[in-house]
């Protein structure tokens, strides 16, 4: 965590940094991509790849800084090995658990060179499909950290969503979401 703050401080002190859009402007960005998702604190699980998509609005505060907020549909979860889990019972190798979330990323974006932004924020999320897991929490909270690059309004975004809240309502499990998300979007000036 200390390294992350140090990296952010170094990026903030960069000279000659500027954004793609005029100060005071708003943009709207539809985004589509993939999640590479798993959970912490569960043995014999593997990452799974699934869909992510949504919409993000951004306000350009200065040449160096913008704020954004969005609504993302995110299929997360994990693949399993042969194991008996207290949450879902006995599962076979290769089975997947695939809850769907509506996440609300609220991000601070620091532009270090034209088009390149370092991102840090908060992300509340709400489960919209539990995939038949009765002991699953319906609220999730994570810290997204990432980078994006914009060229001619096309934006490539890569971020890691570090889950802070337990996803199961089971005392024996302290599992949290761990999601790497890659999306491609297009910024429309408003």
Region roles according to the model:
Residues 27, 45-90:
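Glycine- and aromatic-enriched membrane insertion/assembly motifs of diderm outer-membrane
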Residues 1-31, 184, 188-190:
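Bacterial Sec-dependent N-terminal signal peptides
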Residues 87-120:
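Short, structured interface segments that constitute the first stable element of a domain
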Residues 38-46, 75-100, 126-141, 166-180:
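Flexible, solvent-exposed loop segments that connect beta-strands
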Residues 30-36, 53-59, 63, 71-73, ...:
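Residues on the lipid-exposed face of transmembrane beta-strands in outer-membrane beta-barrel proteins
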Residues 21-23, 62, 113-115, 151-154, ...:
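Outer-membrane beta-barrel channels and translocator barrels
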Residues 48-52, 62-66, 99-103, 113-117, ...:
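Short connector loops at helix/strand junctions that flank enzyme active sites
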């Amino acid at each position: 965590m200390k390294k992350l703050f140090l990296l952010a401080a170094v990026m903030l002190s960069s000279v000659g940094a500027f954004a793609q859009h005029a100060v005071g402007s708003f943009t709207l960005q539809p985004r589509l991509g993939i999640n590479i998702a798993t959970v912490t604190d569960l043995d014999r699980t593997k990452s799974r790849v699934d869909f992510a998509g949504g919409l993000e609005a951004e306000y350009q505060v200065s040449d160096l800084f913008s704020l954004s907020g969005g609504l993302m549909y995110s299929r997360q979860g994990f693949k399993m090995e042969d194991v008996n889990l207290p949450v879902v019972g006995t599962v076979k190798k290769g089975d997947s658990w695939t809850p769907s979330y509506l996440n609300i990323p609220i991000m601070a974006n620091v532009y270090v060179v034209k088009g390149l932004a370092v991102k840090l924020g908060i992300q509340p999320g709400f489960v919209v499909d539990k995939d038949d897991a009765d002991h699953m929490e319906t609220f999730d909270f994570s810290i997204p950290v990432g980078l994006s690059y914009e060229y001619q309004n096309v934006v490539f975004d890569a971020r890691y969503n570090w889950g802070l809240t337990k996803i199961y309502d089971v005392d024996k499990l302290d599992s949290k979401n761990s999601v790497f998300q890659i999306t491609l979007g297009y910024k429309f000036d408003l």
